[in-house]
Each structure stands twice: as structure tokens, then as C-alpha cells.
Amino acid sequence: MSKYDSHLKCSFCGKSQEQVRKLIAGPGVYICDECVELCNEILDEELIRPDGPMTKEPVRPGNPKTRTSLKELPKPMEIKDYLDEYVIGQDEAKKVLSVAVYNHYKRLSLVQGKNDEDNIELQKSNILLMGPTGSGKTLLAQTLAQVLEVPFAVADATTLTEAGYVGEDVENILLRLLQVADLDVEEAQRGIIYIDEIDKIARKSENPSITRDVSGEGVQQALLKMLEGTVANVPPQGGRKHPYQDCIQIDTSNILFICGGAFVGLERVIEQRIGKKSMGFVRPGEGQSKEKRAADLMQRVEPDDLVKFGMIPEFVGRIPVMAALNPLTEETLVAILTKPRNALVKQYQKLLNMDNVELEFSQEAVKAIAQEAYRRKTGARALRGIVEELMLDVMYELPSRKDVQKCMITKEMVEQRSTSELLLHPSSMVTPESA
């Protein structure tokens, strides 16, 4: 036997048994310890690549980037100050968010430190944002993630369906967060997930449905464990899970979920409840405009109102922190155009400045844009659409022209939208004298 053993070689690199530390035998093949180590390195590199195949848990070295210690964690007032730089108005919602997020990551630092002597367990408090479209719900959640330097993912509740039906599984929400975290499971488990259009998965009535509601109550049921905290199996390539697929395990106990929705009609539920308590007296909000009355009513929302709206009680119980955002006024829209750090006017001024052209919006033009956006009833989202329409011809022509120093956007351009004005206005500016 020893006669043949001396001639054993690695089937991959060709090294003999004497040249390596260990030679592993298989049915008709041999592999040395050096080739095994090389294979492990190749697999690890594939796991780290965002487009590479994944197994159960990607191996990631290093310390987490998230601010989890109390010393690094910004205080509620600091969080609100940061939000003020990017989001105009909504002061009450900002305070609620700042306190809730600060307490959430305080809880996370306590869990990681594991030095609590009195064994008091702090429960997670997910957040519900209610407000009309374009009022800043997504932007608030996104800005929170920026100040805390944590992974942030956005999901649309309307695309989710109950397991076993056509559509996305709720676990695909976690996959988006994992991808944003560069496949770092530990980092993803400290992130923030914003679930938009959460009001669209309300069941059709307060009473439990006899028929299946696969994109309503069924999705709420599927989200319960994820919101509360569970170890979820996430399919690495997305889509439906199947028995022979390797899944990544993610613990959602420390992921902060922020749910947002317009909740159109919820104010009527609140008004009905309040009206019953104030029978014989002046109705709340009487004499106010419809929008103002609806906004005031939303500030008085209670969990029972959400249940009557169509959210199941178990779901409402897992989002204890609620904040209502006010609809945007014309004055607020004017401020949104000009004041935030990344205001639309500043963005377009920077774009034209790269072509050596100065861009200026007259105050009357800004007001006219805000008035048109207010009429569209889509909040701040309407602003970008209007400015894009205004600037299209200007930004098409100016890069090819070298004689324009300044571009002025006037009230007439906003109101008339004539192509001739947009093209002729830059040419009326002072141009450098030809040599």
C-alpha cells in the first residue's frame, strides 16, 4: 500500500503528498489543503460582490458603520435641526420622529451593550406617518436615515401579497435593505425600512372578511411578525421562496419600520367619533376650510380610528408612534422651492452654473409656481414637474450657446408657458461683446 501512497498527487494543482500539509481523498480524486483554501477565497469574493451569488450569510469583516453608541447618537433636538435643513414645516411630526428614533437607537445600544442590571426590556416602537401625498413623509424618513448613517430602503405596500399568491412576498422588503447595506447582514439589521401606501392594504370593512383579501388584510397579517421582530428567511435573488433555495436569515428585532400613507377618508371616521361626544355643541372645526378642518382632525387620530378605517388591531398595536403631517400651503410651497439645502431652485442654479450661466427666479415667478403646484393637489411633487416643464427648452438650448450670461425666469413664463418666451428670454440678457 505504501508503494502507491508515495505517488498520490492533488488532482487540481498536481503537488505530491510530500509537498502539502494535507491531501484529502475522494472517489478517484484528491485535493490538497492549499487548493481548499484557494476555493474558500474565491467563494468569499463572490459573496462580497453585489451581483454575485449569495449563501445563507455573507461573511463581512470590520466594525459596523452605524452610530449605535450613546455618545455618537445625535440628540432629538439635533435630529430635528438636521430635518429642518431639508424639510420645510411639519414641526410636530419632526418632534415625534426625532424622539421616537432617538429612543429606538438608545434601545439598540442597550441591547448591544448587554450591561443592563435591572433586566428591563425596552420594546421597539415602530412609527406611522399620516398625511396627504407630497407632504414629505418619504423625505422625512430618508433624511432620518442620513443623519443616523444607517441603511434605508423604501417599499410599496401595494405590490405585496399574501404568501402563495401572485405578487411580492413581504420578505422582499428585507432584501432591498440588505442590498442597500452591501449584503452586510449586521448593518442591515440596524437599518430603517419605510413602507409607503400602507393605507392601501386596509381591509374593506371593520368586520373580518369571509373571502380572501390577498393584498389587504392578508398582507397586514404577513407583516405582523416582521414589525414585531422575527428571524426572517430572505430569498437572495428575490421572488418567491422554494424548498431548495438557500435563504439569508435576518433578525428584524432592531430594524425600525416607518409606515406611511395618505389615509384618505380617515378624517371622516375621526369626525364621527368626536361628533358623538360633542352632540348639542358646536361641531369641531366649524367655520374652517375643508383642508384645514381635515388636517386638524388628523391630529386627533386614535388607534380605534385606524381599526375602523380597515387596519387590523394587531397591526395598529405594532405601530404605537403616530404622527400626522399637515397639507402644504402656498406659503410652504414657496419656502420648499427656495429654502432647503437641496431646494429645487438651488439644484437648477447649480446645473446651469456648470454651463457658465447664472439662473435667477423672480419672487413673482416662485409664487406663481407654488400657486400652480397647490392647484394640482399633489404637494411638493408637483413643484419638480412644473419647474421641469419651465426649464426644458432653456436647458435644451443653453448648453449650445456661449453668448448667454444670465437666464431669468419670470411670472409671465410660468403663467403662459409659451415656447417663444422660453427661447427668447435668454437672448435678451446681456452678452459678452464679441472680440
Swiss-Prot record:
It comes from Crocosphaera subtropica (strain ATCC 51142 / BH68) (Cyanothece sp. (strain ATCC 51142)). It comes from the Bacteria. GO terms for biological process: cell division; proteolysis involved in protein catabolic process. Residues 1-51 form the ClpX-type ZB domain. InterPro entries: AAA+_ATPase, ATP-dep_Clp_protease_ClpX, ATPase_AAA_core, Clp_ATPase_C, Clp_protease_ATP-bd_su_ClpX, ClpX_bact, P-loop_NTPase, Znf_CppX_C4. ATP-dependent specificity component of the Clp protease. It directs the protease to specific substrates. Can perform chaperone functions in the absence of ClpP. Belongs to the ClpX chaperone family. This is ATP-dependent Clp protease ATP-binding subunit ClpX. One of its GO terms (cellular component) is HslUV protease complex. ATP binds at residues 132-139. GO terms for molecular function: ATP binding; ATP hydrolysis activity; ATP-dependent protein folding chaperone; protein dimerization activity; unfolded protein binding; zinc ion binding. Zn(2+) binds at residues 10, 13, 32, 35. Component of the ClpX-ClpP complex. Forms a hexameric ring that, in the presence of ATP, binds to fourteen ClpP subunits assembled into a disk-like structure with a central cavity, resembling the structure of eukaryotic proteasomes. Keywords: ATP-binding, Chaperone, Metal-binding, Nucleotide-binding, Zinc.
